[in-house]
Amino acid sequence: MNPAPGSSIIMIHPSRFSVPLFEILQGKYSYVKGQTLHSSLRNPGVFSRQLFVHLYKRALSRCTYDEVLSDWQLFEAGIRARWRGSRYESGAFKASTFQSWVDTVKMTLDQLLLNNIYHILHTRTNLSYERYVDWVVAVGLVPLFVSKPDRALVKSITSKFSADSVGFSSDKYKTMKTVLMTFKRELTSVLETVTSIYIPDFSEVQLYFDGSTTAYFGVYRGQRITVEVVNRPIIFNGEVTFDSPVQRLFNTVMSCHRTAEHAKLCQLLNTSPMKAVVGSTSNNLYKDILNHLEQSSHKSDPKREMLQLLIKLAENKTVSGITDVVEDFVTDVSQNIVDRNKLFGGGGGGPSAESTAQGLKKQVSGTVFKCLTNQINEQFDTIHKLEKERDMMLRKVHTLETHLSQCRAEDKRLGEVSITSSLLTTDTLKSLLNIHDSSLSLHAASVNKGDNVHNSFFSQYVPPFREVSQDLTSLWESEVFETFKLTPVIDNQGQRLYVKYSQDTVSVLLGPFTYVITKMYEMELITDVYSSLSLNEIADGLYKSSRLYVYMQDVGAKYNLESQEYFDAASAASAAAPAAGRTQSPSAFSQQAQHGPP
């Protein structure tokens, strides 16, 4: 879809404003160390942990006290039947029995939920958290293509969680059956959502802004799709400025890239060997040659005479001047010529007989004029060929100008307003051409003999691109840290090991993805503590804060006081763990980071 001329619809993407931003994220321009923070930012493990927390909490939230009590009574009766004659009422027996039940319930939950959720989180679906982060960081807009859920995938996964398949078909294990059915229903809802939403890649979609409705929409495979606005861009005079980190870094990134490109050009130019031939541009150079010949030999030298003739012919531009040169040459040479007719007689002997000097003059003049005539004819042929080439080049230039006019008209029709190019961000070779066309262009100048020439281009100059890269690294880190509030995890030496989501990062980045993109309104955002813990650690914390654990604690308290003491100690330990996680300093997190984030 292309906007019609005069339409209020403006193409936002792809354009010269948006495509370079995604190319920067892909490392096409000046990929520096600080940009690796973006890889941590787009880590899909954070959303996977949130899905895990949601599924695990929901699975344990539907069980009832009666179901827990019924399962406990059934378990306790089975223990009594197997250990007849034992001291059923002893504290040790009761504590051992209840502890066995608690541990087996936990192991069953891990086998039923933990292992299967691991498998689900690694199932390939349409929804991509990484592409969502790329769109937010680049342009602040997220296109969404909503289709029908993948029923085949949903059925293949949820079929594994029927009561019959896991051995809960009888009236026993009421608690586990409730957990299983609740988990299956919630899993079905989540899978239908994540298989029906697709975030296209930046090369697959076009984004537009409708000025009449002030709304954004996209086109994906010929279909109109929704565009969610996370950070609204600014459109002014046909130019689009995105409210995004990469937009703010764009000029600095391109400046660093062009500086490195300039350094590469200097390296290539300075690597090749260079030689300079120094000589005088004076027109009196041939006179120096004649003086040298005269000084080297005082005798008459035919080569010197011929060279002198050629030089004098080159100096004269008129026919009369050339005639005078020939006459002077013949006069000088004839002084050394013996006229055979005068000496021996004969040869006609009449007054009209041609002398040797006259014959020489006639022959030299004829030869010279013949050479000049041939040269003039060659010049006319060359001029004729050049005229033909000129006509051909004019036709080519006219054709190129016609194509250029058509391209400019097409750009204007698409709403592309011409803007002044920046010397820092445009192509280096084009920038050099612009410099040569400007008033700063170099001009030729004559250099007097004996003077020295100082030209900086002959020095091994390389722009300081390393310092620029270091500055860009610091700017990347500052922009990402301040925009998304990431938390660095450092060791005792002050070295950063990795970064993790803070609570502000969860709210700023994961919140819109959960509630605006996927529209999972019943899902709670995870805390920053869970963003870097392993799934086993998260499962332990969720289990000890669940409704099931509270009911089991109450049953144990009423069954045996010793079990109550056990639960009190476990509760104190579980309460201390999250508190320690919330108050832990970055250096303390280094103990968890020895193997990196999970």
From Swiss-Prot:
The organism's taxonomic lineage, starting at the top: Viruses, Duplodnaviria, Heunggongvirae, Peploviricota, Herviviricetes
Protein family: Belongs to the herpesviridae portal protein family.
Assembly description: Homododecamerizes. Interacts with terminase subunits TRM1 and TRM3.
HAMAP family: HSV_PORTL
Protein function: Forms a portal in the viral capsid through which viral DNA is translocated during DNA packaging. Assembles as a dodecamer at a single fivefold axe of the T=16 icosahedric capsid. Binds to the molecular motor that translocates the viral DNA, termed terminase.
GO BP: any one term: chromosome organization
Intracellular or extracellular location(s): Virion; Host nucleus
GO CC terms: host cell nucleus; virion component
Transmembrane segment boundaries: none
Superkingdom in the source lineage: Viruses
Alphabetized InterPro entries for the sequence: Herpes_Portal
Pfam family, one: Herpes_UL6
Protein name per the record: Portal protein
Keywords attached to this entry: Coiled coil, Host nucleus, Viral genome packaging, Viral release from host cell, Virion
